Every structure is written in C-alpha cells, then in structure tokens.
Amino acid sequence: MPRAILEINSERIRHNVKKLSEFSGKKVIAVIKADAYGIGSIQMAKILEPIEEVDAFAVACVEEGVELRKMGIKKEILILGGVLKDEVPLVEEYFLTPVVSDIEHLRAIGNRDIKFHVKYDTGMGRLGFLNEVIHDPRVEGIMSHLSSPADEEFSKLQIKKFEEIVKKYTKVEKIHMESSAGVVYRVPFTTHIRVGLAMYGEKPLKNYPVDIKPALTLKAKLISVKELPENYPVSYSRTYVTKKKTKTGVVAFGYADGLMKTLSNRSYLLYKGEKLPIFGNITMDMTIVDLKNTDAKVGDWVYVVNEERTFTELAREAGTIPYELMCNLSKRIKRVVV
C-alpha cells in the first residue's frame, strides 16, 4: 500500500476541459508535456482521448510522444520542442507532428512527407521565427505563445503581431496561441486553445472566468503520533521548539516527494478540514506537524492538496508557481484515477 497517493478526478478533468472549450468556442490541444506536469501523461491522455473537445495532445519532445503512442494513444501529438535530425525516423514511425521553430528543424525534416506546425516568437524570446513565412504545403498549423498573460497590454500587442503573421498564410487548418491563462482574450482568429494547468482546476489568474473545479487530491499517511514535552526541539537544526506539551505527528511526505523545504515552519497540512501547522524543517521523506486536539492516529491520511487548498495556493505560500510544485512530485507517489 503506498504511503502517498495523488488522486486524479477524471470526471472533473473532463468537466474542466469541456468548460474551457465552451468558454473559448474552440477545440482543445491538451498540453501533457513533462509527464502532464508531473500528474501522469498516460493517465491524462487516456482520460481525455475519448472526448470530442480534445483534438490533439502536445508534449515537449519526441520521446514523450513515442511513449504515448506505445500506450495506444491515437489522436494527433504535437512536439512543441521541435525535431532534430536524428529524431526524424521516430517522428515518421510514430506519426508525430513536430513544431518547427528554427530553420534547422525544417532542414531536419527535409523533403519527407511529415506535416508540421510553425511557431512564431511574438514576444517570448524563446522558440519561434520572428516573421519568416514558411511556404510549404505540409504546414498544418501555426502557433505562438503569450509570455505574460496577466499583462493585458503586452498580451494584446502579441496577439496583434501574431494576427499580422496569420494573414500571410492561406488554408491553415490549425491556429493556436491561447494558454490556460490566455483563453481570457478570446482571440477571434485562432481555431484551437492550448491548455494545461486549467485542466486540473488550477486557476492561472485571479477572477478566472471559466467554471473549472479542483481535480487533484494529494494525501500521505501519518506514520507516527506522539506527545512532545515543552521546550523540545523539532527536526533538523532545531528550527522549532515546542512552547508547551504538544501532540505531534510524522507524515510520510517530504521534500523528496515534492513538498518544498521553504514551507518549513510557515505552512500546514490538512486533516478533516483542520490545519496542521508544519513544525521544524521538512525532511527528505517526512514532515512533522502539530496534531492539535484532533483524533488523528497512525495510518490516517493527511492532505497536502485538496479542494480546500490547491497547488496554486500552496505554490503561493512556497514562493513559486504551481507548475514547479507539480513537476517535482516524486515517482513514489502513486497516481490513481478516480
């Protein structure tokens, strides 16, 4: 029996994707790169492939695309990170769709019968052509990426720049730019949205207008319960000392599992709705909490993330972003689709 479980609510995942599609009026390219942000790319692909709102998946590299194909995923798979020369045979064999964002990607493909999308850099300074038009019948789609979707003024400049590029193309099947946060702009000339974080019910912006619901629950077992005397040091470096006789618990979840050490002495875990303050430094495999007057006992589940606190809220406490927390989730956490 695993000591830590990440529950993925399939009904809510599908609800969120349908609401995102409904809000935008567009089909969805589901971004499941980096093992679906640490949640599980195979699990996510199998949840989403059956629904009509999802038109394709997007991953970072060829290896991620091959893995999905080997697990039976049939829908189109975009390779966001492009394609290098030695990867082209796998792209052909597994019917993957590379995103061309550098002239070397185009040269790698050569004259092979491989459809591709062209990416434009409209203000990210990362991957993408600046303004070159690729006149090639194999171009299936064109795309860009919003660098600062919370910045309305700059995002609108990017959208305008991309629109001018789009006008230079004819008969392009797929045009996409909006991310989970970017859907708020309802770009009129795109055909698809490209979303990741919001699928999990994580709201990327304040006052997010899409009706999404938290779909992830992260819980770990309580493996020890005891009472510590007053003035007793807790954890490495003795950064916490009990102020009175205190009932404490040890939870089988530490920074090796993805609970950032920056949360030591400043955050909490949850038990039956009760906030359990973290005492002392979070350690590699365990975290010590104040059990207060709860009835918690060894073997009970303690919650890191649930409906009461999302990854977005936990990330805010840790001084980071939810993507980093999710991507850092350990492989020893069992992923369970419910």
Swiss-Prot record:
PROSITE patterns attached to this UniProt entry: ALANINE_RACEMASE
Q: Which residues carry this modification: N6-(pyridoxal phosphate)lysine?
A: K33
UniProt EC number: 5.1.1.1
User: Pfam families per the record?
Assistant: Ala_racemase_C, Ala_racemase_N
The entry's keywords:
Isomerase, Pyridoxal phosphate
Looking up HAMAP family in the UniProt record yields: Ala_racemase
Q: What is this protein called?
A: Alanine racemase
Lineage start: Bacteria, Pseudomonadati, Aquificota, Aquificia, Aquificales
